[in-house]
């Protein structure tokens, strides 16, 4: 059989519209930091996928911000917040109290299927209010069971808000809603690679500080501009309805002038993709929490693993805690955009991702 020579783009240059992880890959290869990589093919129109060929003849696929290190079944499982928490609880790991409820259209679809028509355990969103009455009190968080970057995560305070949120989920064809207790603890992201804690930071929700001169809306727009200038890809228009709802809870409107030094939290979520601010904690995190993150990465067989952790005091070992989510493709673009030190640290980590075929 004739041996074909691979047609690899050995001199592909980074481009602004390429996925940030692929640009880092290309920069590292061009700089000679990946001596085992023979060549890289990048789909040029969108720059969202890449094929790496190593000198051993092995290949690796990069898909968006997924470096191609984790097993597909593990990645699929942790995309589902309900399944993830089932596994965590079986291992004695604390998670927020909560349960899953199928949206009516999806519940009807399953109940009519050949296999699930015998399942008596299917519960739909008509049962969510009764569950809250029995198990917890408002406010609660309602979120799509599958999703990322905090999209759709809503803090609800009343039965009417619950009904409104679930109705919007139904319109968006969300299949499963997760209802969870609200936690009054700081929120952290811990990143593990091959059993090593390589990054850890506190996530603080998007907020502004008043100057006594400008309206809240003007300050929000200024903050948005600052984030964009930092390279943060923040879609503020998607957050605006949630900002208005949170302000309304405290008797505020976007047109109000924020008092001098008045700090106003704008969102109930702290995701960096929603404008949250990271605070590095690598020097203060207690080893107990690094060990917990490593244990979770092992449970799910994830070489790259992001653990979202609520913890009362991350500097001590016996603090109250709860694991909020596990991520198999924890994007770090937002953290990298916050400073040169963070960029250098994460770039070195990403180079490690690509050094060897597996």
Task: Kindly give the residue locations of the regions a language model identified.
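ATP-binding N-terminal substructure of ATP-dependent carboxylate-amine bond-forming enzymes
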Residues: 1-90, 107-110
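Residue-level detector of anion-binding/catalytic polar loops
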Residues: 34-38, 94, 196, 303
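Active-site nucleotide/adenylate-binding loops and adjacent lid/helix of ATP-dependent enzymes
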Residues: 63-64, 74-236, 287-290
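A short, surface-exposed helix-loop junction/capping segment
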Residues: 2-12, 64-67, 146-149, 255-278
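A short beta-strand motif that forms the metal-chelation/ATP-contact edge
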Residues: 50-60, 189-193, 197-199, 315-334
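C-terminal active-site "lid" helix and adjoining low-complexity regulatory extension at the edge
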Residues: 247, 274-291, 297-304, 311-358
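Oxyanion-binding "anion nests"
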Residues: 218-265
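Conserved beta-strand edge residues that scaffold enzyme active sites
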Residues: 44-46, 102-103, 204, 311
């Amino acid at each position: 059989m004739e041996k074909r020579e691979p047609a690899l783009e050995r001199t592909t240059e980074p481009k602004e519209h390429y996925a940030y992880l692929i640009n880092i890959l290309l920069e590292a290869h061009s700089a000679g930091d990946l001596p085992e990589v023979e060549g890289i093919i990048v789909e040029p129109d969108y720059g969202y996928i890449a094929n790496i060929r190593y000198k051993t003849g092995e290949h690796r696929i990069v898909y968006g911000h997924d470096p191609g290190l984790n097993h597909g079944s593990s990645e699929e499982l942790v995309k589902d917040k309900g399944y993830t928490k089932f596994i965590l609880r079986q291992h004695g790991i604390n998670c927020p109290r909560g349960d899953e409820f199928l949206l009516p259209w999806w519940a009807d679809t399953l109940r009519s299927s050949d296999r699930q028509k015998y399942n008596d355990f299917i519960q739909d969103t008509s049962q969510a209010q009764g569950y809250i009455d029995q198990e917890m009190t408002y406010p609660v968080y309602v979120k799509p069971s599958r999703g990322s970057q905090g999209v759709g995560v809503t803090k609800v305070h009343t039965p009417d808000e619950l009904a409104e949120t679930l109705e919007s989920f139904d319109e968006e064809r969300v299949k499963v809603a997760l209802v969870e207790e609200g936690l009054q603890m700081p929120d952290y992201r811990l990143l593990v690679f091959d059993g090593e804690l390589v990054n850890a930071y506190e996530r603080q929700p998007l907020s502004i500080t008043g100057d006594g001169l400008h309206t809240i809306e003007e300050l929000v727009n200024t903050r948005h501009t600052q984030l964009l200038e930092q390279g943060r890809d923040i879609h503020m228009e998607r957050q605006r309805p949630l900002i208005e709802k949170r302000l309304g809870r405290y008797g505020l409107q976007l047109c109000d002038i924020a008092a001098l030094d008045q700090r106003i939290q704008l969102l109930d979520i702290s995701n960096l993709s929603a404008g949250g601010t990271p605070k590095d904690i690598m020097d203060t995190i207690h080893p107990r929490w690094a060990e917990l993150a490593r244990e979770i990465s092992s449970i799910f067989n994830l070489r790259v693993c992001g653990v979202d952790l609520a913890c009362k005091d991350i500097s001590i070992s016996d603090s109250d805690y709860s694991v909020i989510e596990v991520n198999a493709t924890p994007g770090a673009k937002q953290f990298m955009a916050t400073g040169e030190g963070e960029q250098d640290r994460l770039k070195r980590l990403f180079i490690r991702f690509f050094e060897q075929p597996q």
